[in-house]
């Protein structure tokens, strides 16, 4: 089965894959206003840091086509999710495409958004090729959250590496954390790998330690929403736990990080804003109440994994090894300020 794109431009509107409907149905939302794009981002209809950035870029195009105030649109889109730096990076690209002219060039903005999406397709393929080079014949890889094709504009990042390893005859098995509370691993990663015929098993998040202790994992590969200047990683809640357990068992822990996710303006992980989401994501599953009435809830969407727990960063530039502050400072990244 061919995987659907995360989004596609259709002449005068954006067609956005509604990931909330998966794995039950493949549904594309028809978006014609930037406010709809912002809502799709904040409600997690679109997920994955690269896909969020691409969607936001098309949101700017919709604002320009509608004659909306672009400053308001930029602010609204930027605020839709605070942790993923790709969102800011994409919006900065769109601001640069506007130039210094007082008039709004809709065609130039459309070209800029399309170019950003095409580039992501190329860059993710490069990243995946570098990642596959780390894996040995018969490898078993553990993955957290969802980092597949529909989370990007191309083949995906960490899950793309797993899929490519299977296609090249290297992968023995993929283990997928279910990834509470939104179940991205069970709903999205398992769906993508199933479509591609990749052998995989979904596990509860807390089972990863037992799996490693039994010698069933050769590598852990995850994506990221932001990498700070020193190599600290903001990613889906539970990533830090996974990195600690991997270190305890001597298992390499790799972070797939496209250049758009690397934020050299943020000194370390402590400076990264951690999004906190609605309590109902924990107290309810598929609309069913599963928590005791009145139970207090804390629902951070991300955590911070310290750089010293990262074996290597897999990027479109190659595989990066410590010392990360020095290595990251030398990458030819665009200005994200």
Curated annotation (Swiss-Prot):
Annotated pathway: Amino-acid biosynthesis; L-methionine biosynthesis via salvage pathway; L-methionine from S-methyl-5-thio-alpha-D-ribose 1-phosphate: step 1/6
Stored Pfam families: IF-2B
Site for Transition state stabilizer, residues: 145
SUPFAM superfamilies with a match to the protein in the record: NagB/RpiA/CoA transferase-like
HAMAP family: Salvage_MtnA
Protein name, entry field: Methylthioribose-1-phosphate isomerase
Catalyzed chemical reaction(s): 5-(methylsulfanyl)-alpha-D-ribose 1-phosphate = 5-(methylsulfanyl)-D-ribulose 1-phosphate
Alphabetized UniProt keyword annotations: Amino-acid biosynthesis, Isomerase, Methionine biosynthesis
Function noted in UniProt: Catalyzes the interconversion of methylthioribose-1-phosphate (MTR-1-P) into methylthioribulose-1-phosphate (MTRu-1-P).
One of the record's GO molecular function terms: S-methyl-5-thioribose-1-phosphate isomerase activity
Organism: Synechococcus sp. (strain CC9605)
Catalytic site positions: 225 (proton donor)
Family: Belongs to the eIF-2B alpha/beta/delta subunits family. MtnA subfamily.
InterPro entries xref list: IF-2B-related, IF-M1Pi, IF_2B-like_C, Initiation_fac_2B_a/b/d, M1Pi_N, NagB/RpiA_transferase-like
Gene symbol of the encoding locus: mtnA
EC number: 5.3.1.23
Gene3D superfamilies recorded: translation initiation factor eif-2b, domain 1, Translation initiation factor eif-2b, domain 2
């Amino acid at each position: 089965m061919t995987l659907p794109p995360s989004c596609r431009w259709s002449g005068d509107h954006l067609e956005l894959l509604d990931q909330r409907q998966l794995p039950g149905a493949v549904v594309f939302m028809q978006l014609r206003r930037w406010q709809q794009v912002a809502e799709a981002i904040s409600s997690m209809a679109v997920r994955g840091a690269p896909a969020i950035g691409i969607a936001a870029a098309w949101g700017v195009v919709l604002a320009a086509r509608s004659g909306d105030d672009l400053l308001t649109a930029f602010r609204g889109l930027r605020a839709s999710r605070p942790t993923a730096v790709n969102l800011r990076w994409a919006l900065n690209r769109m601001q640069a495409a506007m130039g210094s002219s007082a008039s709004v060039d809709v065609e130039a903005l459309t070209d800029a958004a399309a170019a950003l999406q095409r580039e992501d397709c190329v860059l993710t393929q490069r990243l995946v090729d570098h990642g596959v080079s780390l894996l040995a014949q018969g490898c078993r890889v553990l993955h957290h959250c969802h980092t597949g094709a529909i989370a990007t504009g191309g083949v995906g990042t960490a899950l793309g590496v797993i899929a490519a390893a299977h296609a090249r005859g290297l992968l023995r098995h993929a283990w997928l954390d279910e990834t509470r509370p939104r179940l991205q691993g069970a709903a999205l990663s398992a769906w993508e790998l199933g479509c591609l015929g990749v052998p995989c098993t979904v596990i509860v998040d807390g089972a990863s330690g037992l799996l490693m202790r039994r010698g069933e994992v050769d590598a852990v590969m995850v994506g990221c929403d932001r990498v700070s200047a020193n190599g600290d990683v903001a990613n889906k809640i539970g990533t830090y736990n996974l990195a600690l357990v991997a270190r305890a068992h001597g298992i390499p822990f790799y972070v797939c990080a496209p250049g758009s996710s690397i934020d050299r303006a943020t000194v370390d992980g402590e400076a990264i804003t951690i999004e906190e989401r609605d309590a109902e994501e924990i107290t309810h599953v598929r609309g069913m109440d599963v928590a005791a009435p009145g139970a207090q809830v804390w629902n951070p969407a991300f955590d911070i994994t310290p750089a010293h727990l990262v074996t290597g960063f897999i990027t479109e530039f190659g595989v990066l090894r410590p010392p990360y502050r020095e290595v990251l400072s030398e990458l030819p990244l665009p200005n994200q300020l």
